[in-house]
């Protein structure tokens, strides 16, 4: 029979081995926890950096709009369009602005101008005239709910009728019947609901809008685009007689502002807003629409 001393001596190495295993297990668990924590810290830092960048971007977008309004209000000859840039908050900011009168207003433009835009975008003349008629019918108040236009929408199985009021947003153009979606998508770059004018500003209008004016041949369009910058005061007289009634050189108070931000770390943000200049010194402008490329959505605010 072994003495107690011998028994403890025999069991000693086993106990020591068990303790070593436990210690190693604890060290392994701690190393895993340390790894998890380090990943958490890195991800949290990245998330906070992105959030900080978004907040800085919002502040810089607001600054761009304020500077645009300031230029419009303080310069003796109000620029109808232009661009400027500045560096602030570890970022380069480039701003371009153009009046909404450079676009065709869906609520105010006559049928001829609307049809002219679709012709300029490649539609056949007869089809373009039909599209122009459909837009005018959509925005026109119909005294009788059973009118032929509403009936046509029901027959087409669209499940809705013409609004019978102004377009609240240019994207509603997609609801007007018979206009191909491909044409609608292209037309959205050249239409607005914020101009309020039946004419277009020929000094700032893009080529497609100039081509929408009645009586403009390809040669006349090219000649006009070459001469309008050299003689802006004579721009209207450069147009054929039938186009002059649809032309203006007024900028209007609604301005579309495109802002692009490039941070020093290489990240970029951009936003497009439509603002209206007011006479209120405390609130010199109001935002009518906003589109941020980070969310790809357009929000409207009637302010």
Where are these regions (language model features)?
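Compositionally biased linear targeting/interaction segments
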Residues: 2-9, 15-303
């Amino acid at each position: 029979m072994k003495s107690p001393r011998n028994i403890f001596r025999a069991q000693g190495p086993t106990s020591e081995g068990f303790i070593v295993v436990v210690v190693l297990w604890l060290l392994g668990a701690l190393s895993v926890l340390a790894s998890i924590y380090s990943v958490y810290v890195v991800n949290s830092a990245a998330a906070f950096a992105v959030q900080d960048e978004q907040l800085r971007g919002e502040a810089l977008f607001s600054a761009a709009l304020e500077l645009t309004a300031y230029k419009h209000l303080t310069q003796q000859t109000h620029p109808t369009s232009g661009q400027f840039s500045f560096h602030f908050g570890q970022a380069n900011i480039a701003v371009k602005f153009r009046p909404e009168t450079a676009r065709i207003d869906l609520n105010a433009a006559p049928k001829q101008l609307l049809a002219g835009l679709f012709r300029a975008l490649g539609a056949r003349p007869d089809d373009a005239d039909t599209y122009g008629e459909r837009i005018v019918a959509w925005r026109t108040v119909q005294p009788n709910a059973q009118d032929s236009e509403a009936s046509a929408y029901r027959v087409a199985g669209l499940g809705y009728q013409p609004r019978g009021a102004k377009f609240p947003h240019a994207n509603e153009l997609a609801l007007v019947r018979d206009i191909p979606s491909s044409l609608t998508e292209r037309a959205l770059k050249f239409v607005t609901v914020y101009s309020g004018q039946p004419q277009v500003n020929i000094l700032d209008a893009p080529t497609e809008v100039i081509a929408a004016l009645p009586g403009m041949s390809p040669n006349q369009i090219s000649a006009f685009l070459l001469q309008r910058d050299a003689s802006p005061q004579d721009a209207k007289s450069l147009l054929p007689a039938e186009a002059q009634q649809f032309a203006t050189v007024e900028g209007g108070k609604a301005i579309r502002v495109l802002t692009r931000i490039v941070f020093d770390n290489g990240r970029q943000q951009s936003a497009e807003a439509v603002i209206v200049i007011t006479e209120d010194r405390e609130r010199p402008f109001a935002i009518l629409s906003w589109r941020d490329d980070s969310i790809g959505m357009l929000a409207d605010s009637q302010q």
